[in-house]
């Protein structure tokens, strides 16, 4: 259901419609960042959503941290279903995403990293875009706002809107499409948005190499290309698992980013410290 306002928080909960979006959040050892992420999620008051949180922290107790627990209570008071999972065995990022996807039931799934704050209205814009474009996924690439004064025209020159609908395409390392990765550095999308002058509340779809940290998929289409079932091909220490899934979806159904992006990267140190194995190099070799 859409969020109940504070005047209704103490009223008995009433089962509403099935959520339009399952928000899938993997987390490990990041209580402050996770609380900020959940605060941004609670601000998405205009969309039916359910939270599925999977904790791989050593104690499996992220939900008990005061700030995290407070934000979970807000979501529940708003009438949002919350599912808390622990997943102690560390078999890698792809396996953890596979585990989360197995617990999803909504027609769309938002994979949201635990270090991303969302501007109010972000999920609604993504959902509107996914439905309008009828493609496999729509992403809101994260922006580091410490870079707002750092304009990088050499990195944004590859920006290319989808003007006549989203089409399937093949992206691989070494193709021209792969060069789009630079769009998502620093605060590049904020600069692109300001140059475009998008109408308030609107969005413009554009071509991507891939989108990290905040991606809304059509669940059926993601699962039809295998989802993250490729995880056994990878060692536990890897990166780029989301790239594999997105490239497969793009080949069949197309995918897009949208600008403006309301996703803000918290710029905390990464928890993925060993990136020697890049999943696309293994899966697409």
Where are these regions (language model features)?
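Short aromatic/hydrophobic "clamp" motif used to bind/position activated sugar donors
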Residues: 109
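Conserved donor NDP-sugar-binding/catalytic core segment of glycosyltransferases
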Residues: 121-182
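The conserved acidic donor/metal-binding loop of glycosyltransferases
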Residues: 113-117
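N-proximal low-complexity "stem/linker" segments adjacent to membrane-targeting elements
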Residues: 1-43
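Glycine-rich, basic loop-to-helix element that forms the pyrophosphate-binding segment
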Residues: 87-104
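C-terminal catalytic/acceptor-binding lobe
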Residues: 2-7, 16, 36, 203-220, ...
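Acidic donor-binding segment of Leloir-type glycosyltransferases
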Residues: 40-85
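A recurrent flexible, glycine/aromatic-enriched loop bordering the glycosyltransferase active site
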Residues: 94, 170-191, 197-217
């Amino acid at each position: 259901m859409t969020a109940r306002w504070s005047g209704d928080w103490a009223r008995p909960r009433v089962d509403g419609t099935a959520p339009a979006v399952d928000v899938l959040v993997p987390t490990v050892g990041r209580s402050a960042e996770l609380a900020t992420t959940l605060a941004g999620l609670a601000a998405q008051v205009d969309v039916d959503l359910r939270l599925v949180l999977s904790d791989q922290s050593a104690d499996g107790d992220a939900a008990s941290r005061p700030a995290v627990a407070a934000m979970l209570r807000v979501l529940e008071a708003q009438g949002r279903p919350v599912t808390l999972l622990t997943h102690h065995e560390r078999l890698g990022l792809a396996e953890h995403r596979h585990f989360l996807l197995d617990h999803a039931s909504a027609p769309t799934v938002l994979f949201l990293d635990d270090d991303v704050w969302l501007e109010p209205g972000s999920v609604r814009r993504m959902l509107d875009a996914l439905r309008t474009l009828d493609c496999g996924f729509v992403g809101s690439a994260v922006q580091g706002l410490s870079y707002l004064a750092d304009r990088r025209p050499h990195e944004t020159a590859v920006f290319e809107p989808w003007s006549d609908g989203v089409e399937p395409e093949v992206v691989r390392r070494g193709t021209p499409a792969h060069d789009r990765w630079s769009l998502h550095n620093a605060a590049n999308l904020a600069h692109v948005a300001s140059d475009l002058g998008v109408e308030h509340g609107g969005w413009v779809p554009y071509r991507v190499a891939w989108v990290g940290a905040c991606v809304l998929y059509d669940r059926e289409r993601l699962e039809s290309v295998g989802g993250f079932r490729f995880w056994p091909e990878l060692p536990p220490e890897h990166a780029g698992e989301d790239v594999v899934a997105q490239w497969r979806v793009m080949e069949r159904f197309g995918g897009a980013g949208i600008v403006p992006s309301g996703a803000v990267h918290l710029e905390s140190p990464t928890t993925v410290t060993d990136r020697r194995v890049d999943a696309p190099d293994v899966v697409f070799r």
